Amino acid sequence: MEHIDIDSEVEYANQMDIQNIFETMGEGKFREMESAFFIEKAKQHDQIFSTGGGIVLNDDCCDILKNKGTTFLLKADCKVLLNRINEISKRPLVDVKNPIESLSLIWEQREELYYKSCHHIIETDKLSIDEVVDELLQKVNI
């Protein structure tokens, strides 16, 4: 199976990171590119996608997540999420004065979409990456 990280693919296609895409093209254009790339790639088989949290803002993407394969919501507390995000990169929606408040608001706005689009939920607050992978594999019986 091929692993596709949607954010990385959008960054590669534009030769800039998400922070710069947001600054130069805006969030709307990023969401448009993110959705178009995901929809196109989802036509193929035997793939594992890593998506950003905003993928659920597009109805077609939600339908694909729910109806074409098995989707996992990797859930974590806002403080844990912020620490994880800051370890890997700057993200425009949390590069603000009060990032915890921003994450909480994003969760409130998207929570229903996340639950509607997933088949399984894994609480990741206290899990290592290996433990999350083990849970994923157990749930898909690999």
Language-model features and meaning:
Residues 60-63, 85-87, 134-135:
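Short amphipathic alpha-helical segments
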Residues 4, 70-72, 120-122:
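Hydrophobic/aromatic beta-strand patches that form the interior of the parallel beta-sheet core
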